[in-house]
């Protein structure tokens, strides 16, 4: 039996579109074992109990690369990461599948090979990298090779996820983005991405509200999320450090000072006045990333 734990992730972090991401302490667990024959799923809806399941697709990709053919598989899932909410559920499935397959096959692939394969399956590194490595990462793909650097985040900051009861697919969220951007908007985001990394690294938390601004994706996607701007405004009134759309949304992620004890209950009271139901969940940065059989990958 192979046990793999993968954290949720929040990508983009405001201006860092498709390159910044952070792992948080919300997890999916995967329990995988080879059996005599067949493919058995436990812990997921019936519609996902087939060969199109993303976990199995990722596992098969890994097995094919290694040249390993399992006789059969039992895959059990314990999921705490909500699907289609902008918290890296698909990245968690891909990473969990690839890591568990590699472990079943005797650990033939090294960490870099696993990471490159996961990005190949998922399509982009902003969620995959922090899910794999933990912490906050800045990532790019260069000729199909994943290049990344860990971002050191000063102590004293925490996150609060505002998770709605409605979903938003990544495909739909990408469809509203423009085909091209103005040069000045690119400069706007480049500067704020640099500021975000520096502010988090140096503990200049008062600068985060400026660094969260973006002109590439958030305003386009906000129209798909009812009450986004009123929620953002209320978060700012409650002395948040910064507010941004988590991944493609619809989850709204809030940065707070560690000592802030009142934000969660106050924003919850505000959210209860809205039509949709919102879950308020305080989170910390997960520093381990993916863990297999109680050891870091």
Curated annotation (Swiss-Prot):
Keyword check for Isomerase: no
Signal peptide limits: none
Keyword presence, Repressor: no
GO molecular function annotations of the record: ATP binding; homoserine kinase activity
PROSITE patterns given in the database record: GHMP_KINASES_ATP (PS00627)
Residues the record lists as binding ATP: 82-92
GO biological process: threonine biosynthetic process
Gene3D superfamilies per the UniProt record, alphabetical: 3.30.230.10, GHMP kinase, C-terminal domain (3.30.70.890)
HAMAP family: Homoser_kinase
Similarity remark: Belongs to the GHMP kinase family. Homoserine kinase subfamily.
UniProt name for this protein: Homoserine kinase
UniProt source species: Clostridium botulinum (strain Loch Maree / Type A3)
Upper taxonomic lineage: Bacteria, Bacillati, Bacillota, Clostridia, Eubacteriales
Gene name in the database record: thrB
